[in-house]
């Protein structure tokens, strides 16, 4: 409008008053630009500064410099031309008056070459390249544990920008996550694809007053991000097993982090806007009519907050982020385009009549068409009625929701994405349930997205370690039964795992071929019969019998579907790391200690000549070799525990004769078995898990059941200089044990395939039989601590009887 009215004026004519408004400049099309487009093809719309050329050019018409506004100046400001709406004034009017105009009174020197000068670039660069270089060097000189000291850290850059930086396989950089503030993302290129890996933060609370943060991608954890990068780059290890991506070439930043933050925005609102952009678009720049404010004012606008809470005007809807309610943080999987603002509205069903909800006291201004009435909008009801929000054309954040499609074939019901917010999903649980514990009809709809989400939530309610709490939901659970709560689940009905409180070992109810109804501790006939069975079978057969019984006790093999439902998992190796696996952990400790005591009794019970005792020791060492070969580290640790008891190690005559008569066995024990046992108990056998059938779980079980009294020697990390490292290794082993439970089961099935166990041999390796043999029918019912203490005294007496102390 304005451009058409004054199209006949020469563009350098000065006026005393502005003739157009900022809205006219931004909203209307200039007729002058249409008519004289050919005349301005070579015109640069940026500000210019003179620079001396080597060669002189012939003087041309003053039209060549018409874009500079070189007519004699007056006291009034010049009129901004519509063609110059993207111009950012580099210098105030007075500076140009005293500077540029003094060179020539009426025209510029044609010997000068005018260089493009960008205002944005000037602000981003902070002045000169030398200044930027110095600032970057200062950042890189910081502590090596500081992320800013590493050039591969790029700060808050958008996802699309990071993908454009990594161009070859192995290229990588670290950036801040815009969708999940506070987290870091590893961006890399692998197999010609840009991949992003979120770096997880793990808070390790050592005690109530001290905790530390570790960073991990999959399994390995590190105290800092630089340590994580050094590990994956130095070892050329895949950052993800699924993708196989390997990083080795860092992409370094060339400017300070300050410039990156200024370019892509430092405020949370600006980061949100960058996060939801699918295609990069240059935002419309706002032309300021006040040229006298200069760079200082423009610079403060860039570095300051671009949002002004009041007196905004424009054609877009007002920003809702100025309301009092705090914005909720986004989850990593949620879309920023559908961020819920303000209070939640109850979910609507298809069967209900659409009722008009009371409108909030928020006034919408601008010419943007209103959204479809079928789309549910949530605003804050706590805003003051008198506070009207007015938009700004160029500086509103975040962007308004997308306009509804005009295609009649696409219905709103087919786009449930507006409800993918976690707050929207959980709004189903907040209304108070009726007395009959059934969900209200107004909160459910047939074949609805919300109902599917509610079903998914119900399936994951129990045994959740989340720190979030839903009071209304907790009240509902306490009032309703599990059957009513899961009434809508047809296929996979959730069954609450059973917290076992009774041991699976029942010595007095044990049906035995060798034992009578009541027996005394260490009956001679039973000891003799058990020793015959042990002597008449080869170590390989004995090892398979032990492996079979260990797999049954640990619930690796022969687990019925009923037991699986009771446990809530498919293997006992998973159950032992869960809170309600307390009883299984106690049973495993019982079997381990009972087996070790039984082996010690087998050696110390040889009250005859020395040769018999040495032969028994030789057979037990061979058995340790076999169970190690079969991968039964549980039994292996029990045997090694027995051989390492002080009552056994003090038998100097027995060990000396073993070295003479069975030299190879003694060497195997000293050079192979003992180092491997130490290796296992220090948690260093993480890589030796391929052929394992029953992993070593005793250190983990001991740690989780510290309140229980165990046989001495299991809490070895308490008096070790590397105690913390050993403890951490066992916690890492626990992860692998639970993760590889299926592998252990397959290994055990493969080894025991076609094996036909002997009934009597199987009986003597059952825990109930060993308890009755060692403590009798009455003593087996005593407390564990009391039984172990008394039997320790018995073993000491037997050892001193065989070889009296000197």
From Swiss-Prot:
Coiled coil regions in record: none
Ras-GEF domain boundaries: 538-805
GO MF annotations, alphabetized: guanyl-nucleotide exchange factor activity; phosphotyrosine residue binding
Keyword Transferase among UniProt keywords: no
Region of interest (Disordered), residue spans: 308-343, 390-412
InterPro entries hit by this protein: Ras_GEF_dom_sf, RASGEF_cat_dom, RASGEF_cat_dom_sf, SH2, SH2-Ras-GEF_adapter, SH2_dom_sf, SH2_SHEP1/BCAR3/NSP1
Sorted UniProt keywords: Guanine-nucleotide releasing factor, SH2 domain
GO biological process: endothelin receptor signaling pathway; epidermal growth factor receptor signaling pathway; insulin receptor signaling pathway; positive regulation of MAPK cascade; small GTPase-mediated signal transduction
Pfam families in alphabetical order: RasGEF (PF00617), SH2 (PF00017)
Every SH2 domain range: 152-251
Record-annotated disulphide pairs: none
Chain's role: May act as an adapter protein.
Name the record gives this protein: Breast cancer anti-estrogen resistance protein 3 homolog
Organism (species): Xenopus laevis (African clawed frog)
